[in-house]
Amino acid sequence: MKNSNERLNDAFYALKKATCSVRKSVPGVYKMFGTEDRLLYVGKAKDLKKRLSSYLSINRMSVNVYTMVKQIVRLEITVTENETEALLLEAKLIKSLKPKYNIIMRDDKFYPYILFSKHKYPRIVLHREKRSEGRYTGLYGPFLSSVMTRHIIATIKKAFLLRSCPDNFFATRARPCIEYEIKNCSAPCMQKITEEDYAKAVQMAHKALTGQSKEIQCELFEMMCRFSNNQDYESAIVCRDRLHALKSMKECMGFQTGIHGDVDFIAVYKRQDLYCMQVVFFRDGVNYGSQPYFIESVGNASDADIVNMFMLQIYNDFPSVVYVDLPSDYDTNIMSTAIKQLMKREVDIRLPATRDELKAMGLARNYAMEALNRRVRNTAQDTDLEEFATFFDLLKAPERIEIYDNSHISGTHPYGVMVVCGKDGLLKKEYRKFKINTVTNGDDCSMMHEVISRRFKEIPDVLPDFILIDGGRGQRSAVYGELSRLGIPFACIAKGPGRVAGTEVFYFSNGEKLSLDPASKLMHFLCRLRDEAHRFAITSHRKSRDGKLQFSTLLNDIPGIGKTKGKAILAYFGSIQAMKHARVEEISKVPGISLKLAKRVADYLKESQTTLRA
């Protein structure tokens, strides 16, 4: 087998041979092949000789280019009539042959969408997984910011009174929830709105999200005037509030950008050899969200070449206009001509020039920077998981790690928690709290046994690749039987001598005790996981403790309301937050509560509301 230097010499020989075979200043396409004739890379060049020569400058090579070049065994050259023909041929070869180093990586798993569920009365929710066919009647996005997405959802709910509750909650309601009371929902669960009227509201929401809100605004304005003329001021105020909500949503989604028609903006952001191409979509002038793509550059292609190759690979149907984030000497005619030949229609490739165009491209560039920085962070997360697998002797990097901890004060208000970590970092939607039921003496080991047992009874279908428990030998013994039966590897992390940070020790399932270098990245990663579980456990314990103390103090101070009646009131309304907004008539419906007592409760809650917690 040849060593690294011999392989590099063979690659340089193949490159020199190919370089000598072409005339100066001719455009074309080159294919690089490795051992067993595997296609490594396809590239195009305006000047083939100049481009191929650039691969011979070892001192100017990046690590990625060097890694690819030393695998080259032979090259194939195709000379074309012009650069446009070379661009089209390159795109065709990449799409059909999928070379190893011409991969475009798409990343949409982090980004939020707005989803309308498939239901008689659809709910509107934030959703992070695009591939959910059959589960929705409308899907909008992706949006870069979950904060912006939640604001849009809240605005849509306020404007059209749509529900956002889970289906099981919707199906079991006995009375309208607090969302109805604060005019955020039309309470379809209690038939406060007909199916037909609710469907109309959903349709209006769809139109608003696609920028077709002008006709909705006109209709609402006419209704507002009509209600006002008829002195139905309450209905007129509802229409007015809906108009304000639509205006707020338009500003949030960036409708007022001065961009018209179907337009895409492609921003380019680069860190070393990794590119992020951020595509921001405008359809009918509406900012429809954005999508990042990642390209690892291993060839000596220019930024313009990479953008051109990218566009021809990802688009099946181009919009009318595409703005690209490239220097002013970029030749837009080459790409426009290539698209015309490929699509049989005109597509205008432009550089941004007006204030609105530059503003939109700046937005796309900021998105690209954030997306690429996020990807770099996630690459670091992958490294942590690989080191994790090595230390704990796992066959592969874990995709799901569960971390457990308990919290209590002398056995009171005990809670156990489960924190989850995956390839995308901490998965907070997967966190779980377990109120300890069987242990009252503060025995941490028995508490952990209860938590682990309940976890796999309550959620039997989702198994972790590894479990990390905050504890020592006692916790290991407490959970060993259950986790061994399930075949789940685990370890306990305990404070070291003097409880000094960085001296933690690990008790493996087989009883082995190991430690790590306090300064190692893996130690920091494991301690972060342990600390997150500890934080969540303490928070859960405090909420339980404070809530119970507060509830007890609150209701016991009301004359005529004892422990039994207090529990009945809370059970009826479900939460103190719901009680705050309850009317006297509603409170009097609680069994055992007279109208007089109900008024006393309502007055007391009103006076005390500044001290209440939801």
UniProtKB/Swiss-Prot annotation:
Pfam family, one: GIY-YIG
UniProt keywords, alphabetically: Cytoplasm, DNA damage, DNA excision, DNA repair, Excision nuclease, SOS response
Origin: domain of life: Bacteria
Subcellular location field: Cytoplasm
SUPFAM superfamilies linked: C-terminal UvrC-binding domain of UvrB, GIY-YIG endonuclease, RuvA domain 2-like
InterPro entries: GIY-YIG_endonuc (IPR000305), GIY-YIG_endonuc_sf (IPR035901), GIY-YIG_UvrC_Cho (IPR047296), Hlx-hairpin-Hlx_DNA-bd_motif (IPR003583), RuvA_2-like (IPR010994), UVR_dom_sf (IPR036876), UvrABC_protein_C (IPR050066), UvrC (IPR004791)
GO biological process, one term: SOS response
All copies of domain UVR, residue ranges: 214-249
Residue ranges occupied by any GIY-YIG domain in the UniProt entry: 25-103
Single annotated GO MF: excinuclease ABC activity
Gene3D superfamilies: 5' to 3' exonuclease, C-terminal subdomain, GIY-YIG endonuclease, UvrC, RNAse H endonuclease domain
PANTHER family on file: UVRABC SYSTEM PROTEIN C, UVRC/OXIDOREDUCTASE
Similarity field: Belongs to the UvrC family.
Entry-linked HAMAP family: UvrC
General function of this protein: The UvrABC repair system catalyzes the recognition and processing of DNA lesions. UvrC both incises the 5' and 3' sides of the lesion. The N-terminal half is responsible for the 3' incision and the C-terminal half is responsible for the 5' incision.
UniProt subunit comment: Interacts with UvrB in an incision complex.
Protein name: UvrABC system protein C
